[in-house]
């Protein structure tokens, strides 16, 4: 079975993949064997991954709040993730 691309996977899987890649980048940078240019490229990629992870966590928090608001249980609804098309 072919591996799904990042855009075809679930938000949780994308979060986990982004976090794993971010951790690998941090390890490479901590070793100190990267050139300045490689370090800058890794840093830029890391910032993008961090932002992706932060957004995924915010969406997860919103989903939990929508599903578990004790003050308004009648408003609990299934979460529909945003379209990845645009």
Swiss-Prot record:
Listed name of the protein: Exodeoxyribonuclease 7 small subunit
One GO BP annotation of this record: DNA catabolic process
Alphabetical UniProt keywords: Cytoplasm, Exonuclease, Hydrolase, Nuclease
Localisation: Cytoplasm
Recorded family membership: Belongs to the XseB family.
Phylogenetic placement of the source organism: Bacteria, Pseudomonadati, Pseudomonadota, Gammaproteobacteria, Lysobacterales
Quaternary structure (record): Heterooligomer composed of large and small subunits.
Record GO cellular component, one term: cytosol
């Amino acid at each position: 079975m072919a591996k799904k691309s990042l855009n075809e996977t679930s938000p949780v899987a994308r979060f986990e993949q982004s976090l794993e890649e971010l951790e690998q980048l941090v390890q490479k940078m901590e070793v100190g064997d990267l050139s300045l240019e490689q370090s800058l490229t890794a840093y830029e990629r890391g910032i993008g991954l961090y932002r992706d992870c932060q957004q995924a966590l915010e969406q997860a928090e919103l989903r939990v709040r929508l599903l578990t608001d004790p003050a308004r249980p009648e408003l609990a609804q299934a979460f529909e993730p945003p379209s990845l098309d645009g």
